């Protein structure tokens, strides 16, 4: 018995439907990468394991009105340089906690705007990323540094602005990679002393 053309069409339609469903259900690996300028999502959640950094708790205007030492970090979510700096920003939050106001600011909304004065984040941004600005309790600029700023330089500026002692040197801690995406800081074991 020869199958009718309608049966062949139904059979092929079923096979193609199952094939299409199978392809759509196939798991696709993550495409996030530290080494490209592609948007992967919130860089602090993805690359530093710390999604609590954004959005910031206070605006710059509120932090200045409360006379809080403020750390502004300008970044872009789709910048490899900002992605690599995310672990440093997370470590600064861990060390300084509630002693300072940490305000990470994505720079896209700042572009093409007019500077509205010292309470406006645009006032301090120089058009580079990342950029770190430490403001003292009276709003004075203690540090304004572009690029991948050494964490010890930022610690020194925050210590000066807050009057709190410096945290342990980064030579006692080092940046490590937990996996292909997340970086973090971990204590370095002291070197064994040799006896002569």
What are these regions (language model features)?
Residues 1-8:
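N-terminal secretory signal peptides that target proteins for export/translocation
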Residues 12-25:
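Bacterial N-terminal signal peptides
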Residues 28-59:
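N-terminal "domain-start" segment that seeds a small globular fold
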Residues 63-78:
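Short active-site neighborhood of thiol/selenol oxidoreductases, capturing the structured segment around
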Residues 81-96:
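Typically the conserved alpha-helix immediately C-terminal to a functionally engaged Cys/Sec
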Residues 90, 101-141, 151, 159-162:
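Thioredoxin-like thiol-disulfide oxidoreductase module
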